[in-house]
Amino acid sequence: MLKCDIHKYFYSIDHEILLSKLSHLIMDEEVFRLVKTIIDSTNLDYVNQELANVIKRRKRYIYHSNINEREKIEHLARLAKIPFYEKGKGLPIGNMTSQILAIFYLNDLDHYIKEKLGVQCYIRYMDDLILIHYDSNYLKKCLHEIEKQVHDLRLSLNEKTQIYEVTNQGFPFLGYRFVLRKKRLHVLLLSNTKRRILRRLKKVADNQKYDFLHQNYFGYLLPADSRGFLYEMKKKRLR
């Protein structure tokens, strides 16, 4: 199995290439100008300044919070990984259009992998790609070709990209672990996914917001073997 991950994907999407792709799709000039304004908003100076302020405030909050040292280190490590925007690069984080544009940006790569490379077992969500094949040499060839295509998009693969054998431990993807046992697929939750969910719920004090967030996670957890974790969430809610 080949698992690919793109380095700082949301912050690295090239405006020029993205707008060129969109120009063949969006015929309405007014709509195109609006989309261009949204995309180019990351070029504004105040964006990085505000991002720096948010990180600074968040660090201050973490230092003075009552969470244990391990959680503090984890939070600070995540903050340290947040990059700043370069001119002509990146999509505004949190914007609904960014989700759609991020999926669209690699659309041609999807077709290349399926139609040119002939990969039958292929999955992608945003910048997480998985190719499954019994021949590792074939996957090496695919990786070489994918690297070239990604480079043409002014992106790069990160260190998480690798080819490895699918064992009885399965493989992680989108917060789950997929395991094949006795010809049956089991979907398990990763430990860090559980911690992230519980940490998020712990922060919510308002009952209405808690219930809304709980229902959202319930939908996410349904595909997985998660009855035990759902019970744990319920117990924490009752406290």
Task: Give the location of each predicted region.
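Conserved polymerase palm-domain catalytic core
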Residues: M1-M126, I130-E145, E165
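Secondary-structure transition/hinge residues
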Residues: K114-L117, R154, A205
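A generic structural signal for alpha->beta connector loops
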Residues: V119, D152-R154, K160
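Right-hand nucleic-acid polymerase module
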Residues: R78-G88, N137-K140, L157-R239
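Acidic/proline-rich low-complexity IDRs
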Residues: E50, D152-R154, R237
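A common structural junction motif
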Residues: I26, E147-L155
